Each structure stands twice: as structure tokens, then as C-alpha cells.
Amino acid sequence: MPTRHLLYQKDIPINDYIRVMIPTVGEVLENEDSYYSMVSMLTAMPIDMMVQLDDIGIDFTTINEWELFLLFFNSLKEQDTSLIFGDFDLKPFQPAINPQNGNVILVNKATGVRIDRALHGQIAGALRKIHHLEKDNRKPANGEAREYMIERMRKKLRRKGMRTADSQLEELIVALVNTEQYHYGFEGTRELSIYQFNESVRQVIKKIDYDNKMHGIYAGTDRKSVV
């Protein structure tokens, strides 16, 4: 589906059984921690979870995103996933082997519905579109670089854990509502889809960046832009 169509959609169809929901800002606010945690489980790349994988003895450079998702799946399927999948229920799905190629898949034996690596990729891609997430395929050049990356991320997570967690979405809403380029109030923002809101954030940032550059040009402080 072309990205422009998402502005007015409530969901993104994946196949005949699965659709990825596009909730409102208000719905996300009421379930912020669990919602973004599930989005992370569905879109995470091994590099995003390098510390967690290292803690259980897995080298993040040796697995792919599908294998990572399978590690999360039992935890994910026990949660309320309605903001992501609507009435599609993950609980009946169990790991199985595809007899055609020997790959691990997830199967609902009662309905025959399957989730494989390709389908998971489509689901993750839809969520990345909704939230403007980049797919991080980076890998360290060698073992020493890998250890350095893990240790640096471990320190970052430790510092983050020492701070009181605030609602990042709420802070972003307050910032935008008090920006002249944004034309919604608090209640109006709650009714926007999370995709509409994320698009608004991106456009406001672009507009402010453009205005600042133009101001610099005319003030004579950004001569590189006119050379």
C-alpha cells in the first residue's frame, strides 16, 4: 500500500487473516508502555537486542530478525495485541516445521493459518511505516568491535534504567501543541491516528529546519547554502 494512503486508513491488510491496526493517539496514550513494547518485539533487529541476547549467551551477529521474533513470541502472544492485530488472536499459534523447506513457522492448528518469516517481514514493515522506524542491518567488523558495541549499549541501558520513565509520547504532544507550525490542540491530537501524528511530527521538524536554514541564509550565517 502506498504510504500516502495510510493517512486515512485504520489498518494495513497483510493477508486474508491479518491486518496491522493504526490506533489513535489516545488509544496509544492509554496503553503506551505495552503498545511500544509490542511494536519493539515485532520490529526488532538483532542489533537492537544485542545486550539482552548476550545475557542469554546468543551472539547477535549469528541470528536473523525472524529467529529473534521467535524468541519473543511466547511472551508476545500472552499480551493483549488488539491495538496491533485487532481481533486476530496469537494465542493458538505454536512453532512447527514447514515440511516443504524445513524452516520454523508458527501455525494455528485449528484454522491452518501460518505465520512465516516472509509474513513477519510484512508485519514488521507495516509497523515501521506507521512509526517511521528504520531497519538497522549493521554488523560489527570483528569480535572486538562487537564487544565494544555491546558494552557501550549496556552502559546506556544502565543509565536509562536509573532515570524515572516519563511518557515520551505525552512530552512530544505537549511540545507540538505549543509549536506554531502544529495546528491541533490536545483533544484534537488524541483523535489523530498514530500515523497521522508521526507524519505531523516529521513535517513540523522539516518545516522548522527549513525556516532555520533560511533565516541563517538571510542573516548571513549559513553561507554554505548559497555557494
Please give the residue ranges for each predicted region:
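Extended, charge-biased low-complexity segments
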Residues: 59-81
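Conserved small/polar residues in nucleotide/adenosyl-binding loops
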Residues: 226
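Hydrophobic, aromatic-lined core segments that form the binding pocket/scaffold
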Residues: 74-162, 166
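An amphipathic, hydrophobic-aromatic interaction surface with interspersed Lys/Arg
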Residues: 1-63, 122, 128-216
